[in-house]
From Swiss-Prot:
<feature type="active site" description="Proton donor">
    <location>
        <position position="319"/>
    </location>
</feature>
<dbReference type="Pfam" id="PF00449">
    <property type="entry name" value="Urease_alpha"/>
</dbReference>
<feature type="domain" description="Urease">
    <location>
        <begin position="128"/>
        <end position="567"/>
    </location>
</feature>
<dbReference type="GO" id="GO:0016151">
    <property type="term" value="F:nickel cation binding"/>
</dbReference>
<keyword id="KW-0963">Cytoplasm</keyword>
<comment type="subunit">
    <text>Heterotrimer of UreA (gamma), UreB (beta) and UreC (alpha) subunits. Three heterotrimers associate to form the active enzyme.</text>
</comment>
<dbReference type="InterPro" id="IPR006680">
    <property type="entry name" value="Amidohydro-rel"/>
</dbReference>
<dbReference type="GO" id="GO:0043419">
    <property type="term" value="P:urea catabolic process"/>
</dbReference>
<dbReference type="InterPro" id="IPR032466">
    <property type="entry name" value="Metal_Hydrolase"/>
</dbReference>
<feature type="binding site" description="via carbamate group">
    <location>
        <position position="216"/>
    </location>
    <ligand>
        <name>Ni(2+) 2</name>
    </ligand>
</feature>
<protein>
    <recommendedName>
        <fullName>Urease subunit alpha</fullName>
        <ecNumber>3.5.1.5</ecNumber>
    </recommendedName>
</protein>
<feature type="modified residue" description="N6-carboxylysine">
    <location>
        <position position="216"/>
    </location>
</feature>
<dbReference type="InterPro" id="IPR005848">
    <property type="entry name" value="Urease_asu"/>
</dbReference>
<dbReference type="InterPro" id="IPR011059">
    <property type="entry name" value="Metal-dep_hydrolase_composite"/>
</dbReference>
<feature type="binding site">
    <location>
        <position position="133"/>
    </location>
    <ligand>
        <name>Ni(2+) 1</name>
    </ligand>
</feature>
<feature type="binding site">
    <location>
        <position position="135"/>
    </location>
    <ligand>
        <name>Ni(2+) 1</name>
    </ligand>
</feature>
<feature type="binding site">
    <location>
        <position position="271"/>
    </location>
    <ligand>
        <name>Ni(2+) 2</name>
    </ligand>
</feature>
């Protein structure tokens, strides 16, 4: 029996060779492989396949999956494929073909009476996003992050304290302990950055043992070469990451002095374009270093006609500056440069800037990491055409993989947690996001944390069915009660694990140590490892890569924007 491609896609979702438009962007991806066996597809519902003795076996719990996501299109850094995904004990157990091995051939994922089904037909499945630049200013950020498709937050803060509003630090053992207790029942994975701005190691070591998974150097606390070198020395001893917001004022040295202080050691450079902070006007050249792991924050993503106008007031508010003091205004002005913001777009498209993050409530928007990433990809598709890697296929597969890596696997690798999160791979924590293609990148349909549905777009709870309006994002059962602590993690250093911190603080959530951090290099950034020679003209701020001027026009209109937020 044969059916048309359209009928097949309507029933089981698209298959190999079919193309999907991502939201209302100009990005199209083509399915590279389908794990199904045509004629043996499984689907749940009345008169469908997943029924007793058909697609559902008689096998007991130890042999079957807890949950199977059927016929989903997976978009990840490693590929764009169609598959069933099996979840067991909160982790990804298998990617392949599901069903009943007693009645069907070549089954990888067994469905039984103990299996729940999530219909992925016609939907896109991605790994939960990892935001590595979060100011913990208010706990309500968690809902905004989760419902946008983020499942891991790394940052610092203690609430709306002046220091936290400006800088991503949770300083000192007392604050670290209290914040770890505070987030213990929040339905998202969290890691804390300790304050790294110090010239001697003892206070930094205290914070690492108290639960900091990384250290953060920030110019508002001091980003002199001595502080940088000291923090990296400590990080080398404890196998943790250092993140840096460098010296915008060039008080203690210029960009070359900071790069020399790194001494070829790996470091995560925040908002590497510079509008968020860093040596003016040329911090962007750090992107070219083989030891630097560069990220952007989303307020400059992508470059539009409104980007520059928005930034001045944001910057004044975040960094406790006074608009009546000329020096403060000059400081703010020095960080906002059209030329470097325009170059940032292209550096992302070239795979030079490896990561995307938010800078939540401190110039950035935590709920827009995902959509700003895809808006940037769209803008570059429109302005630069297909990437060379995509020309043979004629679809945007490589570009899609490059951009999704920026907020999933690469931040996870950078901070030593890619063994747990950051991609859809067997053995990893089942932090997954399901999207309907028209809403891809802006409004997910279901968010799973540790294999359990934690958030979803849900209709009126008093309605006869689940879809009537008003439909908005609500916490689901995975975000309630004791299920929360069973489906989330707090990331710490191995040194903190060795102190018995979990018992000492009375934590219910699992503590997981970051690892293999200090060996990470730019070449480890998936699909985003380019290191061209970058220069910045000190007078015009023009950016060149290998001698080629990087410039583009600001966007006047973007996808994934107002048409999705009318209600």
């Amino acid at each position: 029996m044969k059916i048309s491609r359209q009928a097949y896609a309507d029933m089981y979702g698209p298959t190999t060779g079919d193309r999907i438009r991502l939201g209302d962007t100009e990005l199209w991806v083509e399915i590279e492989h389908d794990h199904t066996h045509y004629g043996e597809e499984v689907k749940f519902g009345g008169g469908k396949v997943i029924r007793d003795g058909m697609g559902q076996s008689q096998r007991c719990d130890d042999a079957v999956m807890d949950t199977v996501i059927t016929n989903a299109v997976i978009i990840d850094w490693w590929g764009i494929i169609k598959a069933d995904v099996g979840l067991k004990n909160g982790r990804i157990a298998a990617i392949g073909k599901s069903g009943n091995p007693d009645t069907q051939p070549d089954i990888d994922i067994i469905i039984g009476p103990g299996t729940e089904i999530i219909a992925g037909e016609g939907q896109i499945l991605t790994a939960g996003g990892v935001d590595t630049h979060v100011h913990y200013i208010c706990p309500q950020q968690v809902d905004e992050a989760l419902m946008s498709g983020l499942t891991t937050m790394i940052g610092g803060g203690t609430g709306p304290a002046t220091g936290s509003v400006a800088t991503t630090h949770t300083p000192g053992p007392w604050h670290l302990g209290k914040m770890m207790q505070a987030v213990d029942d929040l339905p998202i994975n969290i890691g804390f950055l300790g304050k790294g701005s110090a010239s001697t190691p003892e206070a930094l070591e205290q914070q690492i043992k108290a639960g900091a998974m990384s250290l953060k150097i920030h110019e508002d606390w001091g980003a002199a070469p001595a502080s940088i070198s000291n923090a990296l020395d400590v990080a080398d001893r404890y196998d943790i990451q250092v993140a840096i917001h460098a010296d915008s004022l060039n008080e203690s040295g210029f960009v070359q002095d900071t790069l020399e202080a790194f001494k070829d050691r790996c470091i995560h450079t925040y908002h590497t374009e510079g509008a968020g902070g860093g040596h003016a006007p040329d911090i962007i050249v750090a992107c070219a270093m083989p030891n630097v792991l560069p990220s952007s924050t989303n307020p400059t993503r992508p470059y539009t006609i409104n980007t520059v106008d928005e930034h001045l007031d944001m910057l004044m508010g975040c960094h406790h500056l006074d608009p009546n003091i000329p020096e403060d205004v000059a400081f703010a002005d020095s960080r906002i440069r059209r030329e470097t913001i325009a170059a940032e777009d292209i550096l992302h498209d070239m795979g030079v800037i490896s990561m995307m993050s938010s800078d939540s409530q401190a110039m950035g928007r935590i709920g827009e990491v995902v959509c700003r990433t895809w808006q940037t990809a769209h803008k570059m598709r429109v302005q630069r055409g297909l990437l060379p890697e995509d020309e043979a296929l004629g679809a945007d597969n490589f570009r899609a993989k490059r951009y999704i890596a920026k907020y999933t696997i690469n931040p996870a690798i950078t901070h030593g947690i890619s063994h747990e999160v950051g991609s859809i791979e067997v053995g990893k924590f089942a932090d997954l996001v399901l999207w309907k293609p028209p809403f891809f990148g802006v409004k997910p349909s279901i968010i799973l944390k540790g294999g359990m549905i934690a958030g979803a777009a849900m209709g009126d709870p008093n309605a006869a069915i689940s879809t009537p309006q008003p439909v908005h994002y609500r916490r689901m059962f995975g975000a309630l009660g004791k299920a929360v602590s069973a489906t989330r993690m707090t990331f710490v250093s191995q040194a903190a694990m060795n102190t018995g911190l979990e018992e000492k603080l009375g934590l219910k959530s699992q503590l997981v140590a970051c690892k293999n951090v200090r060996q990470v290099r730019k070449c480890d950034m998936k699909l985003n490892d380019a290191c061209p020679v970058l220069t910045v003209d000190p007078q015009t701020y023009e950016v060149h890569a290998d001698g080629v001027l990087l410039t583009c026009e600001p966007a006047t209109e973007l996808p994934l924007a107002q048409r999705y937020h009318l209600f």
